[in-house]
Amino acid sequence: MGSGKAFLFSPSLLWSQTRGVRLIFLLLTLHLGNCVDKADDEDDEDLTMNKTWVLAPKIHEGDITQILNSLLQGYDNKLRPDIGVRPTVIETDVYVNSIGPVDPINMEYTIDIIFAQTWFDSRLKFNSTMKVLMLNSNMVGKIWIPDTFFRNSRKSDAHWITTPNRLLRIWSDGRVLYTLRLTINAECYLQLHNFPMDEHSCPLEFSSYGYPKNEIEYKWKKPSVEVADPKYWRLYQFAFVGLRNSTEISHTISGDYIIMTIFFDLSRRMGYFTIQTYIPCILTVVLSWVSFWINKDAVPARTSLGITTVLTMTTLSTIARKSLPKVSYVTAMDLFVSVCFIFVFAALMEYGTLHYFTSNNKGKTTRGRKLKNKTSASPGLHAGSTLIPMNSISLPQGEDDYGYQCLEGKDCTSFFCCFDDCRTGSWREGRIHIRIAKIDSYSRIFFPTAFALFNLVYWVGYLYL
């Protein structure tokens, strides 16, 4: 063989070379896998971005303006939707912000509401990725709006600060929502027979002004009306009990109109009138009874007390009437004040009667003694006896009896015997014997008992019956 170096095969060298190739192949595989995953992620991200762009394309102001211009082109806001085809259905909803105050003098109440109306207008349908157009009040005058008015409103104010409190929304299917905030002074005719224990249902009525029911139909959007928290309402003398809504039809010369009504049930709080009227009246009546325990000879004290209580009741009755309208019927408070006045006046008259007859008693006793002295020597009469003319009838009287006549007059002598010297004699049997000196004792029992019975009947009758 020729000369040269011999090639020597080494197993260790072959193993190291194979190991290096495997390592390089593994690194290449990992690198390619990362590249593929990154590429897949980028593809998924691009696909997601493409989907988002397709479902929600960006809407520009020019697109909305173009939609509005196309809707208003050829639109006549003087004509209602579906005129000549079918009635326009108006769904109404009311949110009550507050009620009060209630004015019983003018018989009206104030209410703050958000009034919402919804209807369909096929002329306002549009095709767009936007489902609803949220517009301000400037658009209201350009489309047809229902001519709804509040029938029992005396004064209504729309809120304009800082901007007109009106909202208009148009959906792509032609549905229109129109809301506005109103403050209304509405009539509420109060029946004051049970005042101040009265309850009232104050209505709020609205309907179309010119469209009868064959043109416009009103419906409630919800079964009940929503209200804010009543504890912030300025009802003062009243408490909010609840509300209810109804639908009625009014028959008029111009047609049949649908009337929507909300009734606000109110109950009067008695705290103010209890403190201002009832308690002072009761205390004044009780004060008038003090005269029954004062000596009947204390004329200035009993007279001044009686006159003072009468004048106090007159003042209380005048003050109580100031919070009421000038109604022609008697209210529950009028009845109570009048009865209290009668009790006070009767207490004064009781002392007047007592003083009158006790004064006559003394004068007639003196005259009777003089007459007895003159007739003591007359024949036919035993000693110690005298004849006293009593309504054309002469009766013998003892020396210890009063020498004065009974009450003059047919009625009195027929039913009453008012003095001690009238108690004897068969012709006085069956009559009521009243001793003038004991009228105060009778009054101490009669007046409180009668007043307590009146209060029992009064409060049970007005509060529970």
Swiss-Prot record:
Which cysteines bridge via disulfide bonds? 188-202
For this protein, the record's PROSITE patterns field holds: NEUROTR_ION_CHANNEL
Where in the cell is the protein located? Answer: Postsynaptic cell membrane; Cell membrane
Q: Which residues form the signal peptide?
A: 1-20
Q: Which sequence ranges are marked TM in the entry?
A: 274-294, 301-320, 329-349, 445-465
Q: Which Gene3D superfamilies match?
A: Neurotransmitter-gated ion-channel ligand-binding domain, Neurotransmitter-gated ion-channel transmembrane domain
Tissue specificity here reads: Expressed in brain.
* Chemical reaction(s) catalysed: chloride(in) = chloride(out)
PTM comment, free text: May be palmitoylated.
Q: What are the alphabetically sorted keywords of the record?
A: Cell membrane, Chloride, Chloride channel, Disulfide bond, Glycoprotein, Ion channel, Ion transport, Lipoprotein, Membrane, Palmitate, Postsynaptic cell membrane, Signal, Synapse, Transmembrane, Transmembrane helix, Transport
Q: Does the keyword Cell membrane apply?
A: yes
Q: Which GO terms describe its cellular component?
A: chloride channel complex; postsynaptic membrane; receptor complex
Carbohydrate attachment residues: 50, 127, 245
Q: Does the keyword Disulfide bond apply?
A: yes
Q: What is its main location?
A: membrane
Spell out the InterPro entries in the cross-references. Answer: GABAA/Glycine_rcpt (IPR006028), GABBAg1_rcpt (IPR005438), GABRG-1/4 (IPR005437), Neur_chan_lig-bd (IPR006202), Neur_chan_lig-bd_sf (IPR036734), Neur_channel (IPR006201), Neuro-gated_channel_TM_sf (IPR036719), Neuro_actylchol_rec (IPR038050)
Which domain of life does this protein belong to?
A: Eukaryota
Residue spans, topological domain Extracellular: 21-273, 321-328
Q: Domains: what does the record tell us?
A: GABAARs subunits share a common topological structure: a peptide sequence made up of a long extracellular N-terminal, four transmembrane domains, intracellular or cytoplasmic domain located between the third and the fourth transmembrane domains.
Q: How does it assemble?
A: Heteropentamer, formed by a combination of alpha (GABRA1-6), beta (GABRB1-3), gamma (GABRG1-3), delta (GABRD), epsilon (GABRE), rho (GABRR1-3), pi (GABRP) and theta (GABRQ) chains, each subunit exhibiting distinct physiological and pharmacological properties.
| Function (record text) | Gamma subunit of the heteropentameric ligand-gated chloride channel gated by gamma-aminobutyric acid (GABA), a major inhibitory neurotransmitter in the brain. GABA-gated chloride channels, also named GABA(A) receptors (GABAAR), consist of five subunits arranged around a central pore and contain GABA active binding site(s) located at the alpha and beta subunit interface(s). When activated by GABA, GABAARs selectively allow the flow of chloride anions across the cell membrane down their electrochemical gradient.
Q: Its family?
A: Belongs to the ligand-gated ion channel (TC 1.A.9) family. Gamma-aminobutyric acid receptor (TC 1.A.9.5) subfamily. GABRG1 sub-subfamily.
Record's protein name: Gamma-aminobutyric acid receptor subunit gamma-1
| Provenance organism | Mus musculus
Gene name, per UniProt, is Gabrg1
